Design a protein with these regions (language model features):
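Active-site-adjacent segment of SDR/Rossmann-fold oxidoreductases
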Residues: 2, 20, 41-52
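Active-site loop immediately N-terminal to the catalytic Tyr-X3-Lys motif
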Residues: 20-26
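Core catalytic loop region at the nicotinamide-binding pocket of NAD(P)H-dependent oxidoreductases
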Residues: 53, 93-137
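Active-site helix of classical SDR
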Residues: 31-34
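Rossmann-fold scaffold of SDR-type NAD(P)-dependent oxidoreductases
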Residues: 12
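C-terminal beta-strand-loop-alpha-helix "lid" module of Rossmann-like NAD(P)-dependent dehydrogenases
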Residues: 45-96
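Residue(s) in the substrate-gating loop at a strand-loop-helix junction
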Residues: 15
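Non-catalytic terminal and boundary segments that flank Rossmann-like NAD(P)-dependent oxidoreductase
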Residues: 142-154
């Protein structure tokens, strides 16, 4: 085990959705935040064993996630139809963007694996993920969330 050999590395894959929340994303965003919190706690617990922990956050990555977002039907609770239409439209618009990441992802993962950092690190891959992370840090929680609300709930 890592503790027995006194070194090792965990690279946990997550999403910028752990830091940036959108309407109707309760389950998705909360699981991504859970990976972030879990990883940070692991880093504290394992640092004395020379075991590093980092997370890699993607934004819009080359997956079928957006294609699998579905609208509710008449047999389901439809109170959110208007909002679901808006969010679905936003996801459809961005589904083709920023999806040329496989090479960048592979290079970043190899770089992290070859150069473990003793301190916990979050790595962000992709233009949209980096932009969201920077904007949230620059504007702070209150202003950033105001912008998200204006953009998604208008």
């Amino acid at each position: 085990t890592f503790r027995a050999q006194k070194y090792g590395q965990f690279i946990n894959i997550t999403s910028v959705a752990g830091l940036v929340n959108l309407p109707l994303g309760n389950f998705y965003h909360s699981t991504k935040q859970a990976v972030e919190s879990f990883s940070e706690c692991m880093a504290y617990e394992l640092v004395n064993f020379n075991i590093s922990v980092s997370t890699v956050q993607f934004g819009n990555a080359p997956t079928s996630f957006q294609k699998n977002v579905t609208k509710c039907t008449k047999t389901e609770i439809c109170s959110y139809n208007k909002l679901m239409d808006k969010i679905s439209h936003l996801l459809e618009k961005k589904s083709g963007k920023n999806c040329e990441l496989p090479q960048e992802i592979v290079e970043k993962l190899f770089s992290i694996a070859e150069n473990p950092n003793k301190n916990f690190r979050r790595y962000t891959i992709g233009f949209d993920a980096n932009l969201m992370r920077i904007l949230r840090r620059f504007f702070g929680y209150k202003i950033f969330n105001f912008i998200i609300r204006k953009f998604t709930l208008k």
